[in-house]
Amino acid sequence: MIISASTDYRAAAQRKLPPFLFHYADGGAYAEHTLRHNVSDLAGIALRQRVLKNMSELSLETRLFDETLSMPVALAPVGLTGMYARRGEVQAARAAAAHGIPFTMSTVSVCPIEEVAPAIDRPMWFQLYVLKDRGFMRNALERAKAAGVKTLVFTVDMPVPGARYRDAHSGMSGANGPMRRVLQAMTHPEWAWDVGVMGRPHDLGNISKYRGNPTGLADYIGWLGSNFDPSISWKDLEWIREFWDGPMIIKGILDADDARDAVKFGADGIVVSNHGGRQLDGVLSSARALPAIADAVKGDLKILADSGIRSGLDVVRMIALGADTVLIGRAFLWALAVHGQAGVKNLLELFEKEMRVAMVLTGAKAISEISRDSLVRELGA
């Protein structure tokens, strides 16, 4: 199969993966309107094409939290990444580090912090959920610090899990889920051998380290689901801000008032995100929410954005709308599922090439030159 874009990796991943895994990552909440709008709204952002600007010198490099990034992209935290490729978190982290961008480890990764951090030559980021078990949260933070993590991504848009209908249909959850997952694995032998057999242990490594016993998919659905905390408030985050002395990013901001609260709280950054359309259907796409948030807090903290980004062109669009950097999730996961570390490496190269083309044709020689002026106003702002 010819791979020329992230959408090609998605098609290939759908063939390779058992349906319960493909649809778990591909699906969204309820009827998935926001999931679709994340992509379509971003694709509808029109850029101003500029010509005769002498674009012989071009730089994608940017600075973020005292880190140099080869381009304004980081790999987003994705739960169960290690179920999509053998020791998937390690492979994805290595590809990101080799390209000069951050990898963000999920709380619910298969590989534990202690396995991934030593595998790369730059500090990774760590994502943490708000959970009722504060002991686990403190344990995870202490272990992240010990592993050299500098940047914490704190996800605040999951006080309860979203209603994801696809999971029940695919076998990820619901009646006879375990039996359906086994049958699906049997009909996908390449995945069954590479990940199902050779990728063991199929463990939630960070949780197992804390609990002292192996955890599996049932624990992911059970223990974690029952531990999300709907009572959380900004006050509950104060001890984390005091404990964590590195950059702290609040992920899951869609409203300008919440962005202002993040500034008051002392956050170093926010992620404008609707969790990839996986939490509340009908909320704004990240592309539509971003401009108002940027107007409210640009310059007070760093603004990151995710949800719907499928190409380097989309990265340029998000930056023009007000982001400093973006996170990509599904796009890298599909590449990882198809070709492992080499797939993520190729995907990042594709994103970089697409960014370069977009910047040349919009007359932006550096990331700092991408702005609202890069947009066709009546269509993109």
Curated annotation (Swiss-Prot):
This is L-lactate dehydrogenase. FMN binds at residues 106, 127, 155, 251, 306-330. The gene is lldD. Catalyzes the conversion of L-lactate to pyruvate. Is coupled to the respiratory chain. One of its GO terms (molecular function) is FMN binding. Residues 1-380 form the FMN hydroxy acid dehydrogenase domain. Its main location: membrane. It is a peripheral membrane protein. Its cofactor is FMN. Keywords: Cell inner membrane, Cell membrane, Flavoprotein, FMN, Membrane, Oxidoreductase. Its EC number is 1.1.-.-. The keyword Glycoprotein does not apply. Homotetramer. It is found in: Cell inner membrane. The active site is at H275 (proton acceptor). One of its GO terms (biological process) is aerobic respiration. It comes from Pseudomonas putida (strain W619). The keyword Ribonucleoprotein does not apply. PANTHER family: L-LACTATE DEHYDROGENASE, S -2-HYDROXY-ACID OXIDASE-RELATED. It is an enzyme of class 1 (oxidoreductase). Substrate binds at Y24, Y129, R164, R278. Belongs to the FMN-dependent alpha-hydroxy acid dehydrogenase family. GO terms for cellular component: plasma membrane. It catalyses: (S)-lactate + A = pyruvate + AH2. It comes from the Bacteria.
